[in-house]
Structures are given as structure tokens and as C-alpha cells.
């Protein structure tokens, strides 16, 4: 690559082409060195996340969508969360190919816009759905009696539909401002952003609404839940375990997306001219965004692994589904350390439901 080449090897990054932005023209002279061997390990990481995320999230969707009988509230959120992660990972092979080609996008302008739209929308949906799960846990633990009219399957489904509507709106700027941008030499193109003040400001606003705000809501809910758990009457062991699983999901999401979101905010401020940065810091920001993008993308395959590691009932059901067994194994496994006996159950199979006293949501 040329040393001053615009940069957009990943969908979470924007090209380092500052032409047309007042006060930032001097940054065009900054060198644009790539991470050593990034064209090797970044595609490999993306493809690994694609394989694990596709299998894991497709299994969760199959498990919950094919379940007969009434569905508990958290099942609705988990089903939509798995669908969002599934939509996210389906775009990863495209970005893996682009990364392997040094940022060159061989799939045309339409797929550039569509895949960018899918990433933005599913990322927003995931953040809002996790915030919805936190609010549901808050209502179940802290406001159990007062929240009964709100904690119904219809309200949960309406909340998820509202999340998807917001996610579609959040993805629209990608359809407008992202597309093929020329690489130096004019023969190849990359999938990147137009150098527009409007898009940078809009991206900052969306970052606030689709990451910072859900994060604040989540932290508030878990702080209140933590206070409630320390007061008598104490919450039962099953509910504590279900909270532990959901907290692990939330923590993984925040740990994966917080570095990316923070660096993206700095990047947008730099492009707006509000935060002038010297060339060494710009290069560090570029490398940091590349690494943070990889970390964020890996999150799309994390939730099924969390269910597998922390939920014994899910492990039994997964084994039954993989081996074609009848469910006798699931009946023999205690659900004391899973979500299944609490109202936050996600993966109780029908055999367990017939033999275990069900707890209300």
C-alpha cells in the first residue's frame, strides 16, 4: 500500500482521506502504515467468528423459534438477540475478503452499502436488546408487583419490534454515506465513508443513542438489582444464577464494544476538527481501531458460548439436539445453576418443564 493511502480495511473504520474537511487538510500527509501481517490474522479472525457465530446463533434461533407452548419473556429477547448476531456474522466473510486484499472491496457498491447497513443496524439492535433484558431483570427483581402489567409476552414482543425499528433507522446513514471510495492510483476501490461533516456529526449522535444510552440504562438497572440482592428477603439461588448469566452477556458486550466506541468517538472528533491530533497519535488511533474492530466482531459469537459454559440445561439440550436423543439426559441434570428454573429461563426443554415445578417470570 502507498504510505498515504486512505484507509478503510474494516467496516468499523473510515478512510483516512481528509480532503474537503476544513482545518484537516494537513493530516493527509500523515503516514498510513498497516498493522504487521494484518492481512493474514484479521481475515482468519473474522472467518473464525463467522463460523462459530453462524453455528451458535443459528442453533439458538432454532431452539427458541421451534419451541412449542408459551414462551417466557426473556426467551423473546434472547431469540431476537441471536437473530441480530446472526445477521451480523453473515457479513463477516465479505469484510474478511476485503481485509485479505488490503482494503480493496471487490463486491460492488450495492454490497458495500448493504453490509454496512446490516452491521450498523444489528449492532444497534444488540445494544438495545441487552438494555431491554436489563430492564426486564430490574422489573422482575426490584419492581416485581408494580411491573406485572408491563411484563407480558405482548409487551416483550412490542419492545423487540420497537428495537428493530430503531435499528433500521440507525442503519440508514450507512446506506447514504457509505460506498465505494477510490484507492490511490484510481484502479481499485474500498468500502468506506464519504468525508462529510454531516456524517461525522450524525455518527457521534448515533454512538450516543445506540451505545452510551443503553450502557447507562444497563448500569442503572444492575446497580439497583445489586442493592436489592443485599437486602432481605433474599432472592433465591435460581434467580441469582440467571442474573449471573445475563450479567456475563452484558459484560462481554460492553468489554467488546467499549474500546471500539471510544476510539470511534475520538476518530469522529478528529475528522470534525474538534480534536486535532499529530501524526503519531493518528497512526496509533488507526491501529487501535483495527484491533478494536476485531474485538467487537468476536462478540457476535460469544453469547452461545456463554450459554454453553454457564447454563447446564442449555448444554443438555444442545447435546440432545446434536445427538438426536429424547431428552432423558436433560431430565437427569439439575437446573440449579442455569436459567431454567427461574422466570428468566431461556433454555428449559419440554421434558424438564413436565417434571420441574415452573417458576413465574
From Swiss-Prot:
Family membership noted in the UniProt record: Belongs to the G-protein coupled receptor 1 family.
Keywords, in A-Z order: Cell membrane, G-protein coupled receptor, Membrane, Receptor, Transducer, Transmembrane, Transmembrane helix
UniProt membrane topology term: Multi-pass membrane protein
Entry protein name: Probable G-protein coupled receptor 25
Function comment: Orphan receptor.
Membrane spanning residue stretches: 40-60, 76-96, 127-147, 156-176, 201-220, 243-263, 290-310
GO BP term (any one): G protein-coupled receptor signaling pathway
GO molecular function: G protein-coupled receptor activity
SUPFAM superfamilies linked to this entry: Family A G protein-coupled receptor-like
Pfam families named among the record's database cross-references: 7tm_1
Topology, Cytoplasmic side: 61-75, 148-155, 221-242, 311-361
Alphabetized PANTHER family for the sequence: CELL ADHESION MOLECULE, G PROTEIN-COUPLED RECEPTOR 25
Subcellular locations according to the entry: Cell membrane
Keyword Plastid in record: no
Species annotation: Homo sapiens (Human)
Encoding gene (name): GPR25
GO cellular component labels: plasma membrane
Extracellular side: 1-39, 97-126, 177-200, 264-289
